[in-house]
Swiss-Prot record:
One GO cellular component term: membrane
UniProt note: phenotype after gene disruption: Flies display defects in the unfolding and expansion of the wings resulting in a loss of venation and a marked decrease in their size. Lethality is polyphasic with flies dying during early larval development and displaying apparently collapsed tracheal trees.
TM spans (from-to): 19-39, 80-100, 113-133, 177-196, 218-238, 286-306
Keywords on record: Developmental protein, Membrane, Mitochondrion, Mitochondrion inner membrane, Repeat, Transmembrane, Transmembrane helix, Transport
Keyword field contains Flavoprotein: no
Protein name as annotated: Congested-like trachea protein
Domain of life of the source: Eukaryota
Any GO molecular function: O-acyl-L-carnitine transmembrane transporter activity
Underlying gene: colt
Membrane topology: Multi-pass membrane protein
Length: 306
Protein backbone atom coordinates (compact mmCIF):
# COMPACT_ATOMS: atom_id res chain seq x y z
CA UNK A 1 0.00 0.00 0.00
CA UNK A 2 1.38 3.41 -0.88
CA UNK A 3 0.68 6.82 0.51
CA UNK A 4 -0.65 9.45 -1.85
CA UNK A 5 0.11 12.26 0.56
CA UNK A 6 1.94 12.50 3.88
CA UNK A 7 3.58 14.99 6.21
CA UNK A 8 6.72 15.21 4.08
CA UNK A 9 5.00 16.26 0.87
CA UNK A 10 6.82 18.93 -1.13
CA UNK A 11 3.56 20.62 -2.07
CA UNK A 12 2.84 23.88 -0.27
CA UNK A 13 2.13 22.92 3.34
CA UNK A 14 -1.53 23.09 4.45
CA UNK A 15 -1.71 24.02 8.17
CA UNK A 16 -5.47 23.39 8.39
CA UNK A 17 -5.23 19.87 6.99
CA UNK A 18 -2.18 19.18 9.18
CA UNK A 19 -4.17 20.40 12.19
CA UNK A 20 -6.92 17.84 11.55
CA UNK A 21 -4.74 14.87 10.62
CA UNK A 22 -2.27 15.59 13.42
CA UNK A 23 -5.07 15.56 15.98
CA UNK A 24 -6.18 12.10 14.90
CA UNK A 25 -2.59 10.88 14.93
CA UNK A 26 -2.16 12.17 18.46
CA UNK A 27 -5.11 10.15 19.72
CA UNK A 28 -3.54 7.01 18.23
CA UNK A 29 -0.27 7.93 19.97
CA UNK A 30 -1.80 8.18 23.44
CA UNK A 31 -3.95 5.06 23.21
CA UNK A 32 -0.95 2.94 22.25
CA UNK A 33 1.68 4.42 24.55
CA UNK A 34 0.17 5.65 27.84
CA UNK A 35 0.98 2.64 30.09
CA UNK A 36 4.70 2.97 29.41
CA UNK A 37 4.43 6.74 29.88
CA UNK A 38 3.00 6.13 33.36
CA UNK A 39 5.95 3.87 34.21
CA UNK A 40 8.39 6.47 32.89
CA UNK A 41 6.91 9.23 35.06
CA UNK A 42 6.89 7.05 38.18
CA UNK A 43 10.53 6.12 37.70
CA UNK A 44 11.45 9.78 37.16
CA UNK A 45 9.62 11.06 40.23
CA UNK A 46 10.06 8.27 42.80
CA UNK A 47 11.50 9.48 46.13
CA UNK A 48 15.17 8.96 46.89
CA UNK A 49 15.70 5.94 49.16
CA UNK A 50 17.20 6.49 52.59
CA UNK A 51 20.72 5.09 53.15
CA UNK A 52 20.52 1.30 53.25
CA UNK A 53 17.00 1.17 51.79
CA UNK A 54 15.98 -0.21 48.41
CA UNK A 55 14.48 2.19 45.85
CA UNK A 56 10.72 2.12 45.39
CA UNK A 57 11.18 0.62 41.91
CA UNK A 58 14.18 -1.36 40.69
CA UNK A 59 13.41 -0.69 37.04
CA UNK A 60 10.82 -0.72 34.30
CA UNK A 61 9.40 -4.20 34.80
CA UNK A 62 9.45 -3.94 38.61
CA UNK A 63 7.51 -0.68 38.38
CA UNK A 64 4.97 -2.27 36.03
CA UNK A 65 4.57 -5.33 38.26
CA UNK A 66 4.10 -3.29 41.45
CA UNK A 67 1.67 -0.93 39.77
CA UNK A 68 -0.50 -3.80 38.52
CA UNK A 69 -0.27 -5.62 41.87
CA UNK A 70 -1.25 -2.59 43.95
CA UNK A 71 -3.63 -0.80 41.59
CA UNK A 72 -4.58 -3.27 38.89
CA UNK A 73 -4.07 -2.79 35.18
CA UNK A 74 -6.05 0.46 35.44
CA UNK A 75 -3.11 1.88 37.38
CA UNK A 76 -1.10 1.94 34.16
CA UNK A 77 -3.75 4.16 32.61
CA UNK A 78 -3.87 6.73 35.42
CA UNK A 79 -3.86 10.27 34.12
CA UNK A 80 -4.80 9.25 30.58
CA UNK A 81 -7.85 11.51 30.55
CA UNK A 82 -5.64 14.61 30.58
CA UNK A 83 -3.49 13.77 27.54
CA UNK A 84 -6.40 12.10 25.72
CA UNK A 85 -8.52 15.22 26.16
CA UNK A 86 -5.69 17.52 25.23
CA UNK A 87 -3.80 15.34 22.77
CA UNK A 88 -5.96 16.09 19.75
CA UNK A 89 -5.42 19.86 20.03
CA UNK A 90 -1.78 19.33 21.13
CA UNK A 91 -0.82 17.21 18.14
CA UNK A 92 -3.08 19.27 15.92
CA UNK A 93 -1.28 22.45 16.97
CA UNK A 94 2.09 20.73 16.66
CA UNK A 95 1.55 19.50 13.11
CA UNK A 96 -0.20 22.73 12.10
CA UNK A 97 2.74 24.68 13.54
CA UNK A 98 5.14 22.50 11.59
CA UNK A 99 3.18 23.02 8.37
CA UNK A 100 3.09 26.77 9.02
CA UNK A 101 6.82 26.79 9.79
CA UNK A 102 7.45 25.07 6.46
CA UNK A 103 5.06 27.35 4.60
CA UNK A 104 6.79 30.48 5.90
CA UNK A 105 10.10 29.22 4.54
CA UNK A 106 8.86 27.88 1.19
CA UNK A 107 9.51 30.31 -1.65
CA UNK A 108 7.38 28.48 -4.21
CA UNK A 109 4.44 26.08 -4.37
CA UNK A 110 6.68 23.05 -4.91
CA UNK A 111 9.83 24.30 -3.17
CA UNK A 112 11.63 21.62 -1.17
CA UNK A 113 13.10 22.70 2.17
CA UNK A 114 16.63 21.98 3.29
CA UNK A 115 17.15 19.87 6.39
CA UNK A 116 18.15 22.89 8.53
CA UNK A 117 14.90 24.57 7.44
CA UNK A 118 12.97 21.43 8.39
CA UNK A 119 14.59 21.51 11.84
CA UNK A 120 13.57 25.16 12.26
CA UNK A 121 10.00 24.38 11.18
CA UNK A 122 9.88 21.47 13.63
CA UNK A 123 11.18 23.63 16.47
CA UNK A 124 8.59 26.27 15.54
CA UNK A 125 5.88 23.66 16.09
CA UNK A 126 6.93 23.40 19.75
CA UNK A 127 5.85 26.99 20.35
CA UNK A 128 2.33 26.14 19.23
CA UNK A 129 1.89 23.00 21.32
CA UNK A 130 3.40 24.20 24.62
CA UNK A 131 0.42 26.39 25.52
CA UNK A 132 -1.80 23.29 25.66
CA UNK A 133 0.89 20.74 26.46
CA UNK A 134 2.23 22.30 29.68
CA UNK A 135 -0.98 22.27 31.80
CA UNK A 136 -1.94 18.86 30.42
CA UNK A 137 1.45 17.44 31.36
CA UNK A 138 1.26 19.04 34.82
CA UNK A 139 -2.09 17.35 35.51
CA UNK A 140 -1.00 14.04 33.97
CA UNK A 141 2.17 13.86 36.09
CA UNK A 142 0.28 14.57 39.32
CA UNK A 143 -2.36 11.93 38.56
CA UNK A 144 0.27 9.37 37.56
CA UNK A 145 2.38 9.83 40.69
CA UNK A 146 -0.11 10.34 43.51
CA UNK A 147 -0.53 6.58 44.05
CA UNK A 148 2.99 5.62 43.00
CA UNK A 149 4.52 7.49 45.94
CA UNK A 150 2.28 5.88 48.52
CA UNK A 151 0.52 9.08 49.59
CA UNK A 152 -3.16 9.75 50.14
CA UNK A 153 -5.18 10.25 47.01
CA UNK A 154 -5.49 14.00 46.61
CA UNK A 155 -6.98 14.30 43.13
CA UNK A 156 -10.08 12.55 41.81
CA UNK A 157 -9.46 12.89 38.11
CA UNK A 158 -8.45 15.55 35.64
CA UNK A 159 -11.11 18.18 36.37
CA UNK A 160 -10.66 17.89 40.13
CA UNK A 161 -6.89 18.20 39.76
CA UNK A 162 -7.12 21.27 37.54
CA UNK A 163 -9.60 22.92 39.91
CA UNK A 164 -7.46 22.31 42.99
CA UNK A 165 -4.30 23.55 41.26
CA UNK A 166 -6.07 26.76 40.25
CA UNK A 167 -7.50 27.22 43.74
CA UNK A 168 -4.10 26.70 45.36
CA UNK A 169 -1.95 28.81 43.05
CA UNK A 170 -3.95 30.22 40.17
CA UNK A 171 -2.88 29.88 36.55
CA UNK A 172 0.76 29.94 37.62
CA UNK A 173 0.27 26.60 39.36
CA UNK A 174 -1.66 25.11 36.44
CA UNK A 175 1.08 26.14 33.99
CA UNK A 176 3.97 25.14 36.24
CA UNK A 177 6.73 23.62 34.13
CA UNK A 178 5.91 25.51 30.92
CA UNK A 179 9.51 26.66 30.41
CA UNK A 180 10.76 23.11 30.97
CA UNK A 181 8.21 21.82 28.46
CA UNK A 182 9.41 24.35 25.91
CA UNK A 183 13.05 23.50 26.66
CA UNK A 184 12.20 19.91 25.77
CA UNK A 185 9.94 20.45 22.79
CA UNK A 186 11.70 23.12 20.73
CA UNK A 187 14.90 21.16 19.98
CA UNK A 188 13.29 17.70 20.24
CA UNK A 189 10.46 18.59 17.85
CA UNK A 190 13.04 19.92 15.41
CA UNK A 191 14.94 16.63 15.47
CA UNK A 192 11.67 14.66 15.35
CA UNK A 193 10.57 16.13 12.04
CA UNK A 194 14.11 16.21 10.65
CA UNK A 195 14.59 12.47 11.18
CA UNK A 196 11.13 11.71 9.83
CA UNK A 197 11.65 13.73 6.65
CA UNK A 198 15.16 12.33 6.10
CA UNK A 199 13.92 8.73 6.34
CA UNK A 200 11.01 9.51 4.04
CA UNK A 201 13.46 10.95 1.50
CA UNK A 202 15.52 7.75 1.68
CA UNK A 203 12.39 5.62 1.19
CA UNK A 204 11.28 7.74 -1.76
CA UNK A 205 14.70 7.52 -3.43
CA UNK A 206 14.60 3.71 -3.22
CA UNK A 207 11.03 3.42 -4.48
CA UNK A 208 10.66 2.46 -8.13
CA UNK A 209 7.37 4.34 -8.37
CA UNK A 210 8.51 7.40 -6.42
CA UNK A 211 5.75 6.80 -3.87
CA UNK A 212 6.29 6.08 -0.19
CA UNK A 213 4.73 2.95 1.30
CA UNK A 214 2.66 3.00 4.46
CA UNK A 215 5.23 0.70 6.08
CA UNK A 216 7.99 3.23 5.37
CA UNK A 217 5.87 6.01 6.85
CA UNK A 218 5.22 3.98 10.01
CA UNK A 219 8.92 3.07 10.33
CA UNK A 220 10.02 6.69 9.86
CA UNK A 221 7.51 7.84 12.48
CA UNK A 222 8.70 5.25 15.00
CA UNK A 223 12.38 6.11 14.56
CA UNK A 224 11.59 9.83 14.72
CA UNK A 225 9.85 9.25 18.05
CA UNK A 226 12.95 7.55 19.45
CA UNK A 227 15.14 10.43 18.22
CA UNK A 228 12.80 12.91 19.94
CA UNK A 229 13.30 11.24 23.31
CA UNK A 230 17.06 10.79 22.98
CA UNK A 231 17.35 14.57 22.74
CA UNK A 232 14.38 15.54 24.91
CA UNK A 233 14.77 13.10 27.81
CA UNK A 234 16.91 15.27 30.14
CA UNK A 235 14.50 18.21 29.94
CA UNK A 236 11.57 15.81 30.42
CA UNK A 237 13.08 14.42 33.64
CA UNK A 238 13.55 17.95 34.98
CA UNK A 239 9.99 18.84 33.95
CA UNK A 240 8.46 15.80 35.66
CA UNK A 241 10.30 16.45 38.92
CA UNK A 242 9.39 20.13 38.88
CA UNK A 243 5.72 19.50 38.10
CA UNK A 244 5.29 16.78 40.73
CA UNK A 245 7.14 18.57 43.56
CA UNK A 246 5.24 20.40 46.33
CA UNK A 247 5.16 24.18 46.02
CA UNK A 248 8.36 25.81 47.25
CA UNK A 249 10.56 22.75 46.74
CA UNK A 250 12.49 24.30 43.85
CA UNK A 251 12.65 28.06 44.37
CA UNK A 252 14.43 28.81 41.09
CA UNK A 253 12.43 26.44 38.92
CA UNK A 254 14.19 24.18 36.47
CA UNK A 255 17.63 25.51 37.47
CA UNK A 256 17.09 24.31 41.04
CA UNK A 257 15.84 20.92 39.81
CA UNK A 258 18.91 20.49 37.60
CA UNK A 259 21.35 21.43 40.37
CA UNK A 260 19.64 19.18 42.93
CA UNK A 261 19.49 16.21 40.55
CA UNK A 262 23.12 16.46 39.39
CA UNK A 263 24.53 16.92 42.91
CA UNK A 264 22.50 14.15 44.57
CA UNK A 265 21.96 11.61 41.77
CA UNK A 266 24.57 12.36 39.11
CA UNK A 267 24.16 13.10 35.38
CA UNK A 268 22.78 9.63 34.56
CA UNK A 269 19.63 10.61 36.46
CA UNK A 270 18.77 12.85 33.50
CA UNK A 271 17.95 9.67 31.61
CA UNK A 272 15.97 7.99 34.37
CA UNK A 273 12.98 6.25 32.83
CA UNK A 274 14.67 5.93 29.44
CA UNK A 275 13.85 2.21 29.10
CA UNK A 276 10.04 2.51 29.19
CA UNK A 277 10.08 5.65 27.08
CA UNK A 278 12.16 3.97 24.38
CA UNK A 279 9.92 0.91 24.49
CA UNK A 280 6.98 3.28 24.06
CA UNK A 281 8.51 5.70 21.56
CA UNK A 282 8.57 3.51 18.47
CA UNK A 283 5.07 1.94 18.60
CA UNK A 284 3.38 5.12 19.87
CA UNK A 285 4.84 7.35 17.17
CA UNK A 286 4.42 4.67 14.53
CA UNK A 287 0.74 4.59 15.54
CA UNK A 288 0.64 8.39 15.32
CA UNK A 289 1.86 8.49 11.75
CA UNK A 290 -0.31 5.53 10.81
CA UNK A 291 -3.26 7.54 12.10
CA UNK A 292 -2.13 10.53 10.05
CA UNK A 293 -1.81 8.25 7.02
CA UNK A 294 -5.40 7.04 7.48
CA UNK A 295 -6.66 10.60 7.97
CA UNK A 296 -4.87 11.75 4.82
CA UNK A 297 -6.41 8.90 2.83
CA UNK A 298 -9.83 9.86 4.18
CA UNK A 299 -9.39 13.46 3.03
CA UNK A 300 -8.07 12.30 -0.34
CA UNK A 301 -11.37 10.45 -0.83
CA UNK A 302 -13.87 12.98 0.53
CA UNK A 303 -11.99 16.21 -0.31
CA UNK A 304 -9.18 15.51 -2.81
CA UNK A 305 -8.43 19.20 -3.35
CA UNK A 306 -8.19 20.02 0.37
Amino acid sequence: MTTTENVSTERKANPVKSFLTGGFGGICNVLSGHPLDTIKVRLQTMPRPAPGEQPLYRGTFDCAAKTIKNEGVRGLYKGMSAPLTGVAPIFAMCFAGYALGKRLQQRGEDAKLTYPQIFVAGSFSGLFSTLIMAPGERIKVLLQTQQGQGGERKYNGMIDCAGKLYKEGGLRSVFKGSCATMLRDLPANGLYFLVYEALQDVAKSKSETGQISTASTIFAGGVAGMAYWILGMPADVLKSRLQSAPEGTYKHGIRSVFKDLIVKDGPLALYRGVTPIMLRAFPANAACFFGIELANKFFNIVAPNF
